[in-house]
Each structure stands twice: as structure tokens, then as C-alpha cells.
Amino acid sequence: MTEIKFHRVLLKLSGEALAGPGGSGIDLTTVKRVANELAEIKRAYPQVQIAIVNGGGNLWRGEPAAKAGMDRARADYIGMLGTVMNALSLADALEQAGVVTRVLTAIEMRQIAEPYIRGRAIRHLEKGRIVIFGAGTGSPYFSTDTTAALRAAEINADAILMGKNGVDGVYDSDPRKNNEAIKFAELTYDEVLRKDLKVMDSTAGAMAKDTDMPLVVFNLNEAGNIQKAIEGQDIGTVIKGSK
């Protein structure tokens, strides 16, 4: 069996990654595909512990709503509810694939999910359950990228795996718009900031750098890439605190 590099990971999924070809809403076929891939990983490597933070941009974006005149905090809270909708959809697909799953939310909604408690989250992971963190950090103005950096540090993850929608790593410009865009195999967080590469927002990047958390950016749309990232195969771009 292939050796694995990361034993406890935080998988960051954008909301758009669950939207499928339509680009918005929840595409159940796409959700099922992601869930089945995660289930295969758990069967192949039962010792691997997987936590997930998903975005909500397929359902709502707080910042544009605020620019349109809505109260920013309220707009962000709506976005947090969107992440819970995505989390519940993914949890259902995982359960149907035979994986025991727990959804923990930063805002209490006990009828549908457990409240986020760090020790409880770690205990679920140790028992082999996939843990999905919903509702962001529970506070407005913080992105789900920041949530991923925060939760990864809290659960002592070995790495953040950032699945991108159709982009296989970090480039010096948008490869979908520039055919001559150059892909980076490895970067430091300082280089990401200096080159103004749009990997994650500055708050998330600063937290990941401060906690020296490795980040693997890869194409989620290519089947098997989550497992390859866990195994440490040479896919995507690896970002570290230092060379």
C-alpha cells in the first residue's frame, strides 16, 4: 500500500466546487462524486482523519450583498447559513456512501448539527468519523478560508488541502484567461503575499503562516486528487511557512 504523508487533514472546499456545471446552487451529482471519493479514501486508509470546511459562495455571497446596501454583518450571517446547507448536503452523501459523519457548527443549531467544541471535534476524528465544520467562524467579516486556517490549527492538522474548481494549482495569473500563465510547484506564504497571488485572503494566509501549516492547492475536479494529495504525490502547488 502507498505510504501516506498526511494523517490528519483539513479539506477546504469552495461552495462553487459543490455547484457543478451550473456554477450555483447545490448539484447533488457533484456532491455525491466528492463524497464517494472521500469514502474510497476512508476505506483505503482508515487511519486517515479528515475534517472539512466548505464555503457557501454557490448559494450566497455576503460582500456583494453589503455593497448593494445590505448590513454587512447580516449578509455574512446569511452566508454562514449557506455553508451549513452545503455541509448537510455533503454529510448526507457521505452517510449514504457508508461514512459516519458529524456536522459541527460555529453557530448553535442543535436540531440539525452539533455545536463546535474543539475537543469533541478531535474525538470524532479519532473515532474515524469525517467532521464537517459549518457556519464559518461564527463571526461576520471572516471568510471560510480563514475558518479553514483556524480549524486546521485547532485540530492540529498536518495540512490544509484546498480543492479548486478546475484549477490545478497556483499560477502567476489566471490560467483560464492567460494561456502563458506560469504554475508554481512550491511557494512560501511570504512569496504568496509578495507576488499578490490570489490563493486565500490575507487573514487566512497570515494565520496559516503563523501556525506553519502546509497548504496543498489542487484541482478538485480530477478524480483521485484528494487521495493523491493525502499521499503527498506531486500534484498542484505546495505552500509552506518557509523553504
From Swiss-Prot:
It is found in: Cytoplasm. UMP binds at G56, D76, T137, G138, S139, P140, Y141, F142, S143, T144. ATP binds at K12, L13, S14, G15, G57, R61, N165, Y171, D174. CDD domains: AAK_UMPK-PyrH-Ec. Keywords: Allosteric enzyme, ATP-binding, Cytoplasm, Kinase, Nucleotide-binding, Pyrimidine biosynthesis, Transferase. Pfam families: AA_kinase. It is an enzyme of class 2 (transferase). It comes from the Bacteria. InterPro entries: AceGlu_kinase-like_sf (IPR036393), Asp/Glu/Uridylate_kinase (IPR001048), Uridylate_kinase (IPR011817), Uridylate_kinase_bac (IPR015963). Residues 20-25 are annotated as: Involved in allosteric activation by GTP. Catalyzes the reversible phosphorylation of UMP to UDP. Homohexamer. This is Uridylate kinase.
